[in-house]
Amino acid sequence: MRVLVQRVSSAAVTVEGAVVGALRPDSQGLLALVGVTHSDDRDKARRLAEKLWKLRILADERSASDVGAPILVVSQFTLYADTAKGRRPSWNAAAPAAIAEPLVTEFAAALQGLGADVQTGVFGANMQVELVNDGPVTVLLEL
């Protein structure tokens, strides 16, 4: 499981013209792009959620748990792209939807269980993600 985390001052996800998830404008928050591979499980999803919740990448070396920062969770199978050969990425390392969707849901639920204000995109949808990266700070978490 991979989570590409970006510190943001605002973020929103739109599907078919409707905003389905957004962080308050001018709030300090996190955008979490979540990729799942074949060997991932619920335990990994929960451990990564806890790691993200306590990761000190906000201003003054604080974590989302320290300041109650909101988190926007968006599924992102392309985090498992293999570009080693040719010019077309392979997606073979990305888990199929039947495996990935429940784990992305588990990740978001685990964050909520820790006390996070969580917004989400729509799994498998063609999403438009808008964000203002703060810093910029971008970190790849992986278990």
Swiss-Prot record:
Motif Gly-cisPro motif, important for rejection of L-amino acids: chain residues: 135-136
Annotated InterPro entries = Daa-tRNA_deacyls_DTD, DTD-like_sf
Catalysed reactions listed for this entry:
glycyl-tRNA(Ala) + H2O = tRNA(Ala) + glycine + H(+); a D-aminoacyl-tRNA + H2O = a tRNA + a D-alpha-amino acid + H(+)
Q: Per the record, a Pfam family?
A: Tyr_Deacylase
Q: Is Hydrolase among the key words of this record? A: yes
**Compartment(s) where it occurs, according to its Swiss-Prot or TrEMBL record:** Cytoplasm
UniProt entry keywords in alphabetical sequence: Cytoplasm, Hydrolase, RNA-binding, tRNA-binding
Q: What is its main location?
A: cytoplasm
An example of a Gene Ontology cellular component annotation for this protein is: cytoplasm
What's the EC number here? 3.1.1.96
Molecular functions (GO terms): D-tyrosyl-tRNA(Tyr) deacylase activity; Gly-tRNA(Ala) deacylase activity; Ser(Gly)-tRNA(Ala) hydrolase activity; tRNA binding
tRNA-binding among keywords: yes
Q: Which domain of life is it from?
A: Bacteria
Q: Which GO terms describe its biological process?
A: D-amino acid catabolic process
How is this protein organized at the quaternary level?
Homodimer.
Protein function: An aminoacyl-tRNA editing enzyme that deacylates mischarged D-aminoacyl-tRNAs. Also deacylates mischarged glycyl-tRNA(Ala), protecting cells against glycine mischarging by AlaRS. Acts via tRNA-based rather than protein-based catalysis; rejects L-amino acids rather than detecting D-amino acids in the active site. By recycling D-aminoacyl-tRNA to D-amino acids and free tRNA molecules, this enzyme counteracts the toxicity associated with the formation of D-aminoacyl-tRNA entities in vivo and helps enforce protein L-homochirality.
This protein's domain notes: A Gly-cisPro motif from one monomer fits into the active site of the other monomer to allow specific chiral rejection of L-amino acids.
Q: Which family does it belong to?
A: Belongs to the DTD family.
HAMAP family listed in its UniProt record: Deacylase_Dtd
Name assigned to this protein: D-aminoacyl-tRNA deacylase
**Recorded name of the encoding gene:** dtd
